[in-house]
Amino acid sequence: MSYLCCGIIPPMTACHRSLFVPAVSLFLFGLAACSQEPAKPAATTPAPADAGPPAPPPRIRVYVTNETSGNLTIINGDTQAVMATAALGKRPRGIQPSPDGKSLYVALSGSPPAGPGVDPKTLPPPDRNADGIGEVDADTYKLKRVIHAGADPEQLAVSADGTRLYVANEDTETLSVVDLASGTVMTSVKVGEEPEGVTIRPDGKVVYVTCEGDGAVFAIDTQTNKMLKRIPVGPRPRSIGFLPDGSRGYVSLENQGAVAVFDAKQQKFLRLITLEGQGNTPKPRPMGIAVAPDGSTVYVTTGSFSHLFFIDPAKSTPTGSFEVGQRPWGIALLPGGKMAYTANGPSNDVSLVDLTTRQVVKKIPVGTRPWGVALVVRQ
C-alpha cells in the first residue's frame, strides 16, 4: 500500500510527493490463566450469514481544517461521506501532509480573528499557549504533538524529504525553520509584515513567503536559510503556486483582484493578471491557488466573489470562472487534475468540483468556517 500526498494551500498548490509502503501490525493477546474447573465457552454473537470482509480503507482521504469549530473533518474521497471529526485546537488553518502520508501538520493560532483595517487594540489578548503546529496521525486522526514554532502561525510547508517544516508567523514577522525529528526551531528568518503563505519551489532549493502588509514575496535559500530577495508583487498577497518546472510563481493578490506572476529563477516580478468581476457582484478577492499537474492551468479561489477562476499560464490570461461556493478559500486538486475540493467558509461546507465541465458535483457539510484542504491518496 503506498500513498500520494496532495496538500493544500490555500490556499496553496496541490503537491505530489514520494510513496511509501506502511507495515502491517499484528496484535496478539495472551490467554487468561485456566481455573481448576473447565472454562465455559464465551458467549458470542454469530455473524450474519451474508457478512463479508470489512470494507477496505478509502483510496482518498480528504482533511479539512475548520477555523471556528477548532477541529478537523475527514472525508472519504471515494464516497464523499464524512468519516470522522477530530478535535485540534484554536483556529486551525494551514494544513500540509507529510511526504510519506502518515502525518498532517496543522497551523493552530491563539490570536483572535481580525480582518483588514481592524485595530488590534480593540481585540482580546492572544493566547500564546494555543499557538503551534499540530501533528496529526493521518490514520487515527489523533493529535500526536504540538510544535511551538512562533506567534500566530497561519500557513506552512514541508520539505520533500520530510525533515523540515517552514512556518509563517504572522505576529512576529518571521519564518520559522523546524527540525521535525526533534520538533525544535532551528532558526527564524525575519521577513515582512504579516507573513502568510509559504510555498517551496518544486526543486526544493528556495522557500517563498507572502507578506500581506508588505505587498511582497520573500525568497529564502533552504540550504543556508538566508534571504535571497524581496520581490514586490502588489497589495495583500496571499498564496503562491508554481508551474511544475519551477520557472514561474503565481501569487494571489486579495486587494487587487489580480494574480502576480514572477520569475522564480531570477526572483523578479513579471506581470499582473487581472480577474474581472461580473455586473454588480463583489470584486474578485484572490485567495487560494493550485496549478494543474501538467502546468496547463492555474486555478484561483476568490473569497467573497464565490468563483473559481481558470488562468492559461502560456497566455497569462483568465479563461473563465464559475461559482463553487460561499467565500471559497483553500483548494486541493485530486490526482490527474480533473477534480478539486474547495473550502467554503460561511456555508460550512466543501465543494467537489469537476474542472472539465466546470460544475459543482457535490457539497459536503463539514465544521464551522472551513479554511484549508489536504489530501492523502492510497495507491
What are these regions (language model features)?
Residues L4-I9, L31, L270:
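Compositionally biased, low-complexity segments enriched in small residues
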Residues C6, P11-A23:
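Bacterial N-terminal signal peptides that target proteins for export
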Residues V21-L31:
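Bacterial N-terminal signal peptides
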Residues C34-Q379:
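Predominantly soluble domains enriched in secretory-pathway, periplasmic, or organellar proteins
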